[in-house]
Design a protein with these regions (language model features):
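Short, acidic Gly/Pro/Ser/Thr-rich loop/turn segments
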Residues: 53-54, 89, 116
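A short, gly/pro- and small-residue-rich
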Residues: 94-109
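Hydrophobic cores of alpha-helical transmembrane segments in multi-pass integral membrane proteins
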Residues: 80, 110-115
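Thiamine diphosphate
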Residues: 78, 83-96
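Short His-Asn-centered micro-motif
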Residues: 83-85, 111, 142
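Short gly/pro/ser/thr-enriched loop/turn and capping motifs at secondary-structure boundaries
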Residues: 114-118, 147
Length: 182
């Protein structure tokens, strides 16, 4: 619902705080169009799915044609976190720190069944899905996921980015500091 104020209609509190300083209608669509074709990936690779991820990122499948090319080596330069492989409880605070260091807007992809749900590692050391510690935008299941699934997932993420509003861009730091087992 919009808030009427002084003859103008504002879509959210965030847009109301911006006032007349920022145009948020057509400009948001143009910025989203540019963002969906320019992902800066930070790969957080911990297990065997990493080999398949390297295959997908290589020249045969060429993620560059979808705007997800050269990986960044600092989370401060990235806006797409690819979490690939099993996450242990000791790695969970590191993953949260990496997520919090990323620039806004940021997106997270859970790559592989171990990242999505813990996989076949149902024990006390494994995080049962990274969505218990950081927000996830896209799940790509599989052991390991087929390259076609990764490309399809990336196309779905591009569609999600295109439809985002200004309010969706501000996610903030992860409120969860440690992994909890469900």
């Amino acid at each position: 619902k919009g808030v009427a104020g002084m003859g103008k209609l504002y879509q959210s509190d965030l847009e109301m705080s911006l006032g007349n300083n920022v145009i948020v209608t057509q400009m948001t669509q143009a910025v989203n169009w540019a963002r969906k074709y320019s992902f800066f990936i930070y790969p957080f690779i911990t297990a065997c799915c990493g080999m398949e991820f390297m295959s997908v990122a290589g020249p045969r499948y060429d993620l560059d044609r979808f705007g997800a090319a050269f990986p960044r080596f600092s989370p401060r330069q990235a806006d797409l976190l690819m979490v690939v492989g099993t996450i242990s409880h000791k790695q969970a605070p590191i993953l949260v720190k990496v997520y919090n260091q990323m620039t806004e807007p940021k997106w997270v992809v859970a790559y592989g069944v171990c990242t999505v749900s813990g996989g076949f590692y149902d024990n006390y050391t494994t995080v049962m899905g990274i969505d218990t510690i950081i927000p996830v935008d896209l799940y790509i299941p599989g052991c390991p996921p087929r390259p076609e699934m990764v490309i399809d997932g990336l196309i779905n993420l591009q569609q999600k980015v295109q439809e985002e509003t200004l309010q969706d861009h501000v996610k903030g730091p992860s409120p969860v500091t440690s992994a909890t087992r469900i």
